[in-house]
Each structure stands twice: as C-alpha cells, then as structure tokens.
Amino acid sequence: MKNAKRIIALLLSITAIFSLCACGGATTPSTSDTTAAAEATEPTKDPNAPLCDGKTLKILAITSSFGLNTTQLLYDVAMAEGATEVIVGRLYISGCTLEMHVGNAKNNANAYRYTKISSADGQWKTIENVSLAQGLNDEAWDIIFTQQGAAQAGQPNTYGNYVTELMTYIKETKKTPTVGYVWNMLWAYQQDTDQTVYHTVFGGDQMYMYQENLRAAKEKIVPLNMFDRLIPSGTAVQNARTSYFGDTLTKDTYHLNNLGRVIAGYTLWSILTGKEITEVNIGPVSSYDLPIAVELTDEDRLVVMESVNNAIKNPWEVTPSAYPAK
C-alpha cells in the first residue's frame, strides 16, 4: 500500500513538472539549445545527392554583378533542360564584397536590389531597397548561392572571418530549410582589360588572376566545410577561352556577355543537378543589358558542353579545348 502511494506521488510530481514547462515556467533555452533547434530545421544531407532534381529549382544569390552574370540565364537554361518550376532570385549590390554583406546583415540594411524570375510568368521583376532578411524569407529557397567580390576573389587576405559570419547569419535568419549552399568561383578578367586591380594586384596576367581565384577558394572556402558545392564558373570560362571562342566572353573586359553567361549558367545547372551536360538546348539568348539575341551554332553548343563538363571533372585546372582557333 505504501509503495502504491509512493508511485502515485511520483506520477503527480512528474505531471506537475510537465505542466510547468507547458505553461512557460521552464527556464529560457541556452544559446546552444537555440542553435541546435535552428540546425534541426536543416534536412539531413547526403553529400552525394544532387541539390536539384532537374524539375524544381528555387535558388537565391547573395551577390555582386558577377553573380548576376552567373545566374542571368540560369532560368532559361533550366527551362530549356526540362525544369517545370523555377524561381531564381538575386540580392545584388554592384561590387559587393563579403565584408559589405556582413555589414548589411548586422545593420539590417535595406541596401539591395532584389530581382526575381519565376516560371509562373517568366518575367524578371525588380524591387529596390531590400534587406538580406527580406530576400531570404521571400520564398522557400532550396539553394543559397554566394561569392566574394570580383576584385577581391583572388586576394585571400580580403576574406577574414566574413564567410563564417555571413553563413551563420543566413542560417539563423532563413525560416525554411535549405537543401544546399553553393560558392561561386569566379573567372579572370579579359587579358586586355584596363581595370586597375587587374594590373596592380595580378600583374596584368589573366592566368595568374585565374590561379589566384582558385588559391583563395582552396585556402579560405574549402577548409570551412560550409558549402555543399563549389561552382567552377571561372574554370569553365577559362576552358572556353582555349577554344575558337578565344578571349571574347565578356561585354566590357570583365562582365560576361551572353555567350559567357550561357557557359556560366550551364556550369551552375550541372553542379546543381549533378548531371553531365549532354545537350545544350537553350534557344537564342539575350539579357536585360545585352538585348541583341545570340544564336548558338551546333559547334558553339559543343564548345559550351565541353567547357562545362571539363570544368566539372577538373575544376582546379584548365582543360584545353578540342575546338581550337580556326
């Protein structure tokens, strides 16, 4: 009888404890508890699984104009290759660096131009003066894309702790789970550019700038283990420069033209889907700043395919084209 009373008393005590927690009487969770809860919203990842199934793509780029170039034709590529639901968003500031992104995050600054295109209507829309938090939570983004500024990408001393700070902010601020995070490895400027940093930092040497971009990624991005994929945009572009395309893939000696954007777009698509490019089905391409459509010949498509596939296989070095200058 005494044992029965003790058991009943114990059960009543446990019930009281659970009631207290449910009514808010529990202590405030620690920071580690909060972090663990936030991380729990992220799905368990298979490192070998594709980030995109080829049908649905929802990607947000936090970027500069070079990220705009990389993603400008991604929508067109995805739709041409059979996707049915596509949303591409970009939070963009011209020349934006990692340091600037972190400052904007800390100040919740309405500093970005936000552009977005959706398969719902296939039209780019632009909103000015948007914050990182607003863009991150505008859609249930599956993939977050970011990079260093173009002039700083090949300068490891500009990275600081900004990558970690930015990624921490993104994960704490975004309210929906993310399938993957991707880092864009940028291309070198055209050999004859007059951009000051190209000459003062990289000695006016395209291959040196390309190699320094890769070195910075190896030293400052790979060891962090914060990104599910690295996008070898720079290697794909450099591969294509060894073909009969030559050093003609920019519109102004540093921003990509429409042909360069096709190469970058297919590189990103291949990385996200995990698929080798076996066809280049995109039609005539144009952009908001380059409205004259470019029609790819059959041989052009082979060069695009070759440049991308070789970059995926060998992202850290240039693979000479089988279609050299004629």
Regions found by a protein language model. Give the residues of each.
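Sec-dependent signal peptide cleavage junction
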Residues: 18-39
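Bacterial N-terminal signal peptides that target proteins for export
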Residues: 1-11
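Conserved SGNH/GDSL esterase-like catalytic core that processes O-acyl groups on lipids
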Residues: 69-159
